[in-house]
């Protein structure tokens, strides 16, 4: 079943708790939590304290996307904050990605890697045995509300082939410019999880939008 992970980066920050509380009833599967440090990407968002504050408000998995230079420094803080999934960028300053993924698993969380639009899937195939998921960025990271990059579809198909060839259970997650039209194309290409921010939180009826994204 296709999972939908609304990105709270696009929620009303003044009513964040209320928005998160509503997500399960609206049909969401995960809560996507974007962490930006102002260095790896040109924006600053949330940290472990926000995750900790939101944790009691939902039993949905919290999917933390670390857009930071040194992701290993944040494994323990996000474990303590109640995160369920932690993904790290292959483009970060993390020189020991295998070790980082193993540390995330040792902390009791699911682990994955993230690829920016310009990064080929070859950068992550050797990591697939350690990955519960691979997040493919379909926009350049840093800000919400961007348009989907069509080349992502080719990357999804190629990554799906690599995963299947290795007999892995790794999920493919897509983040950026996801709407009902692009969602359908991503699912057809082999995606399992769709991150949607503006599409969900700006919709007149978020529950209906989540149903439309799932297809």
State where each predicted segment sits.
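Short glycine-rich anion-binding loops that position phosphate/pyrophosphate groups of nucleotides
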Residues: 139-141
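Glycine-rich beta-strand-to-loop/alpha-helix junction loops that act as flexible
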Residues: 174-177, 195-199
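Short basic/hydrophobic patches in alpha-helices and adjacent helix-turn junctions
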Residues: 158-162, 185-188
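A short, acidic/glycine-rich surface segment
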Residues: 119-123
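Short gly/ser/thr-rich secondary-structure transition/capping motifs
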Residues: 114-118
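Acidic, divalent-metal-coordinating active-site segment for phosphoryl/phosphodiester hydrolysis
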Residues: 177-189
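Short, electropositive alpha-helical surface patch
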Residues: 84-91, 187-196
């Amino acid at each position: 079943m296709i999972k939908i992970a609304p990105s709270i980066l696009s929620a009303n920050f003044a009513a964040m708790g209320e928005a998160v509380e509503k997500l399960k009833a609206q049909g969401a599967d995960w809560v996507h939590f974007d962490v930006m440090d102002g260095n790896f990407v040109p924006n600053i968002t949330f940290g472990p304290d926000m995750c900790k504050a939101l944790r009691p408000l939902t039993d949905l998995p919290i999917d933390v996307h670390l857009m930071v230079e040194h992701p290993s420094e944040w494994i323990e803080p996000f474990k303590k904050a109640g995160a369920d999934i932690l993904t790290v960028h292959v483009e970060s300053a993390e020189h020991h990605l295998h070790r980082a993924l193993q540390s995330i698993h040792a902390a009791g969380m699911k682990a994955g890697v993230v690829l920016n639009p310009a990064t080929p899937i070859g950068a992550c195939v050797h990591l697939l045995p350690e990955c519960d998921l691979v997040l493919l960025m379909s926009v350049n990271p840093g800000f919400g509300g961007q348009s989907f990059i069509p080349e992502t579809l080719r990357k999804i198909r190629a990554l799906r082939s690599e995963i299947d060839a290795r007999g892995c259970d790794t999920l493919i997650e897509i983040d950026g410019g996801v709407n009902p039209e692009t969602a359908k194309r991503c699912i057809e290409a082999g995606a399992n999880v769709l991150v949607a921010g503006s599409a969900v939180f700006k919709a007149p009826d978020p529950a209906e939008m989540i149903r439309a994204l799932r297809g």
